[in-house]
Amino acid sequence: MESITLQSVIYQIDGQPYEGRLAYDSSRADPLPGLLMAPNWMGISTGAEEIAKSVAEQGYVVLIADLYGQGVRPSNADEAGAAMMPLKNDRALLRKRMWAAYDNLRTTSF
């Protein structure tokens, strides 16, 4: 994974910052297909980043979507449940956040 780069990507949804994580092979100059990754209910974590890097090794640009907002990183099941419940109860909100991440991935150039 020496040439896999993992970087923060900040985008806005309704004026609020969200911070996804982008993984890609920085040694490649050719266009690569993109993959939008939804993390589990614990949000963006070291485990999610490792999965994204592994997929990036296969020739993809991977964006881990931030579903909770910049700086919201649950550290236990209670926090994760509290962060996920609004999205579970409002699928339109979840879709909106996923679409915003997708739009960011689609328009990212590096």
Give residue spans per PLM region.
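Serine-hydrolase catalytic machinery in alpha/beta-hydrolase-like enzymes
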Residues: 8-110
